[in-house]
Amino acid sequence: KRQPAERLPALVAGVVRPAAFSAHLMGIPSLTGCVKGWYKKEWWDKLGLERFDQIVADELFEQAVNLGKAGMGRYLQRLCNAFNWRKDGSADGARLFDDLQTDGVVGPKTLSALSIVLSRNDARRIVHLMNCMQGAHYVNSGANRFPLRKFCVGGWPTRTYDPGQEVF
């Protein structure tokens, strides 16, 4: 008996009309607008990115697309937890918010924590650290999965570096 994975190409071929995919996708006049609209609705709006400075919103969006919403969420939650302390001389251990659970769910608690972190730190610094975490993700992925190495340490790190960006 054939396994489901072995039947997949036949199932897909039976459903998809080959002619529908023969033209270059960019030849579809409304495709770019449809894709942009979909990303705005399903990613930008659902993550509530309009509430943040553009540099932060862009980075969150890019990481959600490239790492998945949960992957970006876990790194964001860790970053917020790392900055969850008062700098104003109050007693050691004084937190700004309850530490976040690093479950990858970017909901009201995570977004509120990020707003607090951003109110006390330069947005460029937070974006820089988010990029550091993303870079570490790619290195770890490449170190642990040989077939992915050319992507993980070849091209993907360009997503974490902007040569015109100020480094602190």
Feature-to-residue mapping (PLM):
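Cell-wall polysaccharide-cleaving catalytic domain and substrate-binding groove, primarily
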Residues: 1-168
